[in-house]
From Swiss-Prot:
Uniporter that mediates the facilitative transport of nucleoside across lysosomal and mitochondrial membranes. Functions as a non-electrogenic Na(+)-independent transporter. Substrate transport is pH-dependent and enhanced under acidic condition, probably reflecting the location of the transporter in acidic intracellular compartments. Proton is not a cotransporting ion but most likely change the ionization state of the transporter which dictates transport-permissible/impermissible conformation for nucleoside translocation. GO terms for molecular function: cytidine transmembrane transporter activity; guanine transmembrane transporter activity; monoamine transmembrane transporter activity; neurotransmitter transmembrane transporter activity; nucleobase transmembrane transporter activity; nucleoside transmembrane transporter activity; organic cation transmembrane transporter activity; uracil transmembrane transporter activity. Residues 73-105, 154-162, 221-230, 327-340, 399-414, 472-475 are extracellular. Belongs to the SLC29A/ENT transporter (TC 2.A.57) family. InterPro entries: Eqnu_transpt (IPR002259). The chain crosses the membrane at residues 52-72, 106-126, 133-153, 163-183, 200-220, 231-251, 306-326, 341-361, 378-398, 415-437, 451-471. This is Equilibrative nucleoside transporter 3. The gene is Slc29a3. It comes from the Eukaryota. Residues 1-51, 127-132, 184-199, 252-305, 362-377, 438-450 are cytoplasmic. A motif (Dileucine internalization motif) lies at residues 31-32. Glycans are attached at N84. GO terms for biological process: adenosine transport; cytidine transport; dopamine transport; guanine transmembrane transport; inosine transport; norepinephrine transport; nucleobase transport; nucleoside transmembrane transport.
Length: 475
């Protein structure tokens, strides 16, 4: 994929984003009024030869979300492991039935709550622990957890399903925490790069979901044992996490990456009208240790990103409210026919694969089109308009349902169309928001701002997951 003059158009805090029409002149202004990036004397901006950095960030994006996606898409495996909790009529505590029936909601809560807490921790650690340490440590923890889950695949847990459920939730919480540290650290790193690299990382996350959904379909078709499928999931995730370690270690070897990863000036909050002091020190003279004593200024970052933050929270709130808790429980209208389409492949194909592929397409479009801009009033309007998707999904054939009995959309094509719309809108709008965030602040605050943007995202996911768990009980 060719990106002409990306170092000029997408450069750090002075990026001028591209739009296809002059009708949006207000959105074509520079994201910051004054240059805030000080190139080291004698250095010229190198080119990303063979798109090496772009490919690495794309792969790191896959590795960042692949663990969570493999956990979620292994629905048949969790149902198999928790099968003793499927019916309260079997003499089990009625609470056991909730473990299986609402497993996706519990999984989402176990994922989003620790994620939110560790984003706060990562914000405090931005200038205290090197990004190199945070990235490698988080990858190592995720790798260890997947090894544990792979071992548990062959362990008979039928006599202690509640214990296994607790272990699964704990593993999900640890995976989510380590993935949060990894994602926010790498995303913060891209804040110092041209904007196309952030787009690569974010699109890679959607590719991770697509890869896991395809793997789920292949395993369902090739294997009759859900344990074999789960083992393949977990081992694949472990291998890819190991690959991410190697790719991250390779990144600083690229001249292009070294240029943008060089130290920056100490934190000083500039306004969009301020000019940097003429005697500002060059980046090459700043000792890395000088950053260790500073905590990024939260107030100015929150003020600068308030509008984008609202969009991020609302976008991910609606997405988490629907996917996966609601959408995975929409059943085909002719489920009892015995067809593999209605019994085996419907949810993996029409929910996980379709949503993740649509999400990927939406994110990839932002490589060429960035409309509306970060200051446009249209952006929050589009984000809020997605609330219309919630009743559309609820009026499909959601099961089980005891209060809302009306099924308005009595055809399988409707949830497919709604899922495409959910994925496309989530991918396109959320990528715009996440790309814009680190570009409306000085370069030295880009990493901290990236963490704040992911905090907004996780807050939306947590609220959406919690509301989805409540909504399921009222349908």
């Amino acid at each position: 994929m060719a990106f002409a003059s990306e170092d000029i158009a997408y450069h750090s805090s002075n990026a001028v984003y591209r739009v296809p029409s002059n009708r949006h002149e207000a959105d074509q202004e520079a994201l910051l009024g004054k240059p805030l990036d000080y190139p080291a004397p004698g250095l010229q901006r190198p080119e990303d030869r063979f798109n090496g950095a772009y490919i690495i960030f794309f792969c790191l994006g896959i590795g960042g979300l692949l663990p969570w996606n493999f956990f979620v898409t292994a629905k048949e495996y969790w149902a198999f492991k928790l099968r003793n909790c499927s019916s309260p009529a079997s003499g089990k505590d009625p609470e056991d039935a909730d473990i299986l029936n609402y497993f996706e909601s519990y999984l989402a809560v176990a994922s989003t709550v620790p994620s939110l807490l560790f984003l706060v921790a990562n914000f405090l650690l931005v200038n205290r622990i090197r990004v190199h340490v945070r990235v490698l440590a988080s990858l190592s923890v995720s790798l260890a957890i997947f090894v544990v889950m792979a071992v548990l695949v062959r362990v008979d847990t039928s006599s202690w399903t509640r214990g296994f459920f607790s272990i699964a939730m704990a593993c999900m919480a640890i995976i989510s925490s380590s993935s949060t540290i990894f994602n926010s650290s790498v995303y913060g790193l891209t804040g110092s790069f041209p904007m196309r690299n952030a787009q690569a990382l974010i699109s890679g996350g959607a590719m991770g979901g697509t890869v896991s959904a395809v793997a789920s379909l292949v395993d369902l078709a090739a294997s009759s044992d859900v344990r074999d499928s789960a083992l393949a999931f977990f081992l694949t995730a472990a291998v890819f996490l190991g690959l991410c370690v190697g790719l991250y270690l390779l990144l600083p070897q690229l001249e292009y990456a070294r240029y943008y990863m060089r130290p920056v000036v100490p934190i000083h909050v500039f306004s969009s009208e301020d000019s940097p002091p003429r005697d500002a020190p060059s980046t090459s003279s700043v000792a890395p240790a000088s950053r260790a004593v500073h905590t990024p200024p939260l107030g100015p970052i929150l003020k600068k990103t308030a509008g984008l933050g609202f969009c991020a929270v609302f976008l991910y709130f609606i997405t988490a409210l629907i996917f996966p808790a609601i959408s995975t429980n929409i059943q085909p209208m002719h489920k009892g026919t015995g067809s593999p389409w209605t019994s085996k492949f419907y949810v993996p194909l029409t929910v996980f694969l379709l949503f993740n592929f649509a999400d990927l397409c939406g994110r990839q479009v932002t490589a060429w089109i960035q409309v509306p801009g970060p200051r446009s009033k249209l952006l929050p309007i589009l984000a809020v308009s997605r609330v219309c998707l919630v009743p559309l999904f609820l009026l499909c054939n959601y099961q089980p349902r005891s209060h809302l009995t009306l099924v308005l959309f009595q055809s399988d094509i409707y949830p497919i169309l709604f899922t495409c719309l959910l994925g496309l809108s989530n991918g396109y709008l959320s990528t715009l928001v996440l790309m814009y965030g680190p570009k409306i602040v000085p370069r030295e605050l880009a990493e901290a701002t990236s963490v704040v943007m992911l905090f907004y995202m996780s807050l939306g996911l947590m609220l959406g997951s919690a509301c989805a768990a409540l909504l399921e009980h009222f349908i």
